[in-house]
């Protein structure tokens, strides 16, 4: 099949088509060399075109038990070489895919110019003009104002905790902004009953759970577009312990007076080093985000930073009962160095705080 990738600025790259269709999205890359099944089913890649920097994708097949959600989320996939297994899977999912492209050059372009819009056209009759038409119709990530609706549950779902878990009496209200399955699994394995609520859940929805912990999940896009989750943090902070991962950290920071900003090309991979400012310990982490906390505000302490660029990786408040992480402690894919995060946040449920944040 013919295939064309149109990059922001109008440059068109020819490739080999592996899965037919036309699509568009923000072109990003991951440096992960394993875990392609988990990456492709991660809801945080919604409305993006995912480029794999590792040259061969698919060399250990496709197994559903590794999926992080029930579908592929990137709008299209770019690789140096895709195996037939992955190409067929993407075709079944209706996701265009191309390979035989110089991904090293493409990744360099993204690193130097930042994440960019792109359009893709794949098919026996595909043309460069088709890809350019997709590029012209492409929106920026911040313009997807209701992206949460594309990745969230529509109705509450309850996952019962393991009876022998250490926190078998805990109820967690997890606001699903695009949650990975492994986050839910990590909480359930520790005994917590996880009540997954829609991204636009109301105070009444949360009150119906009467949670011991409010958890804001990961998700795609601009945290400014998750105003309902931000409002929940503002309502419950100081009354109910709060945790967040990835987008969840950004939402919590915004609710407590902080700011967020778009990164040039983000952090996406399984080898991002993070340093704990108290212990000076460095752990390797899995990350997938294009936005970060700029100014964390006065209510939260920066407890961990990225070794490469000093961006905030951990924001905590002992007084308010808040623990958030920009990276993915649940990994999948990636290292398991930070699984104790789930014990730390569930530990907050043993003595619920009642301290209110100070007024600005």
Residue map of PLM features:
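A glycine-centered loop/beta-turn motif at secondary-structure junctions
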Residues: 315-357
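RNA-binding accessory domains that recognize and position tRNA/RNA substrates
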Residues: 1-171, 177-184, 188-189, 198-200, ...
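Short acidic loop-to-helix transition motifs that present clustered carboxylates
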Residues: 197-204, 222
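Catalytic beta-strand/loop cores that center a nucleophilic Ser/Cys/Thr
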Residues: 280-319, 359
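Residues that mark the start of a beta-strand
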Residues: 169-173, 193, 241, 284, ...
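Active-site glycine-centered loops adjacent to acidic/histidine catalytic or metal-binding residues
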Residues: 10, 102, 246, 289, ...
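Cysteine-nucleophile active-site neighborhood
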Residues: 208, 213-290, 334-342, 348-352
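Glycine-rich phosphate/pyrophosphate-binding beta-alpha loops
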Residues: 33, 288-291, 327-334
């Amino acid at each position: 099949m013919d295939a064309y990738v149109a990059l922001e600025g109008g440059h068109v790259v020819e490739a080999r088509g592996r899965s037919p269709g036309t699509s568009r999205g923000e072109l990003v890359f991951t440096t992960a060399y394993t875990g392609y099944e988990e990456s492709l089913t991660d809801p945080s890649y919604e409305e993006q075109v995912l480029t794999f920097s590792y040259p061969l994708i698919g060399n250990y097949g496709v197994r559903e038990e590794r999926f992080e959600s029930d579908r592929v989320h990137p709008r299209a996939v770019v690789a140096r070489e895709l195996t037939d297994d992955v190409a067929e899977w993407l075709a079944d999912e209706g996701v265009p895919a191309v390979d035989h492209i110089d991904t090293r050059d493409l990744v360099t372009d993204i690193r130097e110019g930042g994440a960019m819009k792109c359009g893709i056209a794949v098919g026996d009759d595909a043309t460069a003009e088709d890809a350019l038409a997709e590029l012209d119709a492409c929106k920026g990530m911040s313009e997807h104002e209701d992206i949460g609706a594309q990745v969230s549950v529509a109705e509450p779902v309850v996952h019962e905790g393991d009876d022998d878990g250490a926190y078998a009496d805990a109820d967690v209200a997890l606001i699903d902004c695009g949650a990975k399955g492994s986050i839910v699994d990590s909480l359930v394995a520790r005994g917590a009953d996880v009540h997954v609520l829609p991204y636009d859940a109301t105070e009444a929805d949360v009150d119906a759970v009467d949670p011991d912990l409010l958890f804001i999940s990961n998700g795609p896009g601009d945290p400014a577009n998750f105003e309902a989750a931000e409002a929940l943090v503002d309502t419950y902070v100081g009354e109910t312990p709060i945790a967040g991962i990835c987008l969840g950290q950004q939402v919590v920071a915004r609710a407590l007076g902080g700011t967020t900003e778009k990164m040039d090309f983000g952090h996406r991979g399984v080898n991002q080093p993070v340093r704990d400012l108290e212990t000076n310990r460095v752990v390797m982490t899995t990350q997938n985000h294009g936005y970060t906390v700029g100014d964390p505000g006065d209510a939260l302490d920066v407890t961990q930073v990225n070794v490469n660029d000093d961006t905030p990786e951990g924001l905590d408040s002992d007084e308010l009962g808040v623990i958030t992480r920009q990276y993915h402690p649940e990994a999948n894919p990636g290292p398991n160095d930070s699984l104790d995060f789930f014990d730390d946040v569930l530990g907050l449920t043993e003595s619920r705080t009642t301290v209110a944040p100070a007024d600005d």
